[in-house]
Amino acid sequence: MEPHFFFTVLWMLLMGTSSTYAQEIFGYCRTPDENSGTCINLRECGYLFELLQSEEVTEQDRRFLQASQCGYRNGQVLEKHFCFTNVQICCANSRMRNQQPQWGNHPQPTQTTKPTKRSGTKLLPMAPNCGENFGDRVVGGNETTKREFPWMALIEYTKPGNVKGHHCGGSLINHRYVLTAAHCVSAIPSDWELTGVRLGEWDASTNPDCTVGKNGRRDCNEPYVDYPVEERIPHPQYPGNSRDQLNDIALLRLRDEVQYSDFILPVCLPTLASQHNNIFLGRKVVVAGWGRTETNFTSNIKLKAELDTVPTSECNQRYATQRRTVTTKQMCAGGVEGVDSCRGDSGGPLLLEDYSNGNSNYYIAGVVSYGPTPCGLKGWPGVYTRVEAYLNWIENNVRA
């Protein structure tokens, strides 16, 4: 196809609509024919990209491609002023991958054989040996300090051409495991490989991360550390094709044991009796991250935002307009214009500072699952997988 004709067709496709059917929700979307999909770059959706390159694009094809656009980038709809490389398309998961992704000649991580019940309890740290936060308490600050939330992880994917990128987040929970969302593991394009986890990061544009204090002295973190992933363990009942994204939780087992430091530490799991069946109404929770999703990123520097939790009934009523159901295994927070999970990562943590035996520690109350697009819409809280509901599953799937 001649390049001029190709871009003419692309222009016609994207000029035809100002609102798209395929709304992105943290990378999850619905195609015009009601299949589940992932909002990714047009070039990475093989069958739609091939369709666009065809010299015989029918009117029906054109309408389907228009309706497939899920192109929000930094809160802007991609219409008249767009860069081709930024065009986002809702690519059907059924067309991107088989039931299990095929990684070419790369060895596939295997599923864990279910250990003896609650075999991992002793492997998971308890307060005060987790959830320690060394950052300065800056109320209302958007950016974290260098040592805040040292359990935060960036998940690395290797794409065609050996191109690497971080498109999800996670949380370190012990020396070998990172907790994340199942959609970050199971609902990715078939030609992406989840290859690693980065720990000890703060500013993704520098290494090591340094700041200059008021006294003029330069203070630096230790360099970040990249760990290969040995095994990926999505929840077995995660239905990737469901609007409700139930059981959206996964574990990543790292190949090597993580060495703790002031910059790399685990977060606490919500094991306190007071945290049982609790969505923490009236309590402040914190979402943190770089704003990384499967299709976009917000910041090089780790961000944070303080949110209020939202009653499940109220959240359910809101998402019923999108034919979604929020269950007791999920929780909702945010809905404040311009804040919400725009500062969090897909798969990243929703954090609660709690107290036990005189100790103040951070606990992971939720895992970022989905929310409105663009993020931070007034009255639309983000939906999180409620971690306490999955403690048995976590404990049964970690091993030494």
Swiss-Prot record:
UniProt-listed Enzyme Commission number(s): 3.4.21.-
Chain positions listed as propeptide in the UniProt record: 23-137
Top-tier EC class: hydrolase
Ranges where the Peptidase S1 domain occurs: 138-399
Disordered, as annotated region: 98-120
Gene Ontology biological process terms from the UniProt entry: innate immune response; melanization defense response; proteolysis; response to fungus; Toll receptor ligand protein activation cascade
Glycosylated sites: N142, N296
A family per Pfam: Trypsin
Annotated binding of Ca(2+), by residue: E201, D203, T206, D209
Disulfide topology: C29-C90, C39-C70, C45-C91, C130-C268, C168-C184, C210-C220, C315-C332, C342-C375
Keywords: Calcium, Disulfide bond, Glycoprotein, Hydrolase, Metal-binding, Protease, Serine protease, Signal, Zymogen
GO CC aspect terms: extracellular space
InterPro entries to which the protein is assigned, alphabetical: CLIP, CLIP_sf, Peptidase_S1_PA, Peptidase_S1_PA_chymotrypsin, Peptidase_S1A, Ser/Thr_Proteases_Immune/Dev, Trypsin_dom, TRYPSIN_HIS
Active site (record annotation): H183 (charge relay system), D248 (charge relay system), S346 (charge relay system)
GO terms, molecular function: endopeptidase activity; metal ion binding; serine hydrolase activity; serine-type endopeptidase activity
Free-text disruption phenotype from the record: RNAi-mediated knockdown is semi-pupal lethal, with 50% of pupae dying at the late pupal stage or during eclosion. Adults display impaired melanization at the site of septic infection (septic injury) using either Gram-negative (E.coli) or Gram-positive bacteria (M.luteus). No significant increase in PPO1 activity after septic injury using fungi (B.bassiana) and bacteria. Survival and induction of antimicrobial peptides (Dpt and Drs) is not affected after bacterial or fungal infection. Aseptic wounding has no effect on survival.
Domain Clip: 28-91
Function: Serine protease which plays an essential role in the melanization immune response by acting downstream of sp7 to activate prophenoloxidase (PPO1). May function in diverse Hayan-dependent PPO1-activating cascades that are negatively controlled by different serpin proteins; Spn27A in the hemolymph and Spn77BA in the trachea. Regulation of melanization and PPO1 activation appears to be largely independent of the Toll signaling pathway.
UniProt note: domains: The clip domain consists of 35-55 residues which are 'knitted' together usually by 3 conserved disulfide bonds forming a clip-like compact structure.
Homology family: Belongs to the peptidase S1 family. CLIP subfamily.
Entry protein name: Melanization protease 1
Upper classification of the organism: Eukaryota, Metazoa, Ecdysozoa, Arthropoda, Hexapoda
Gene name as annotated: MP1
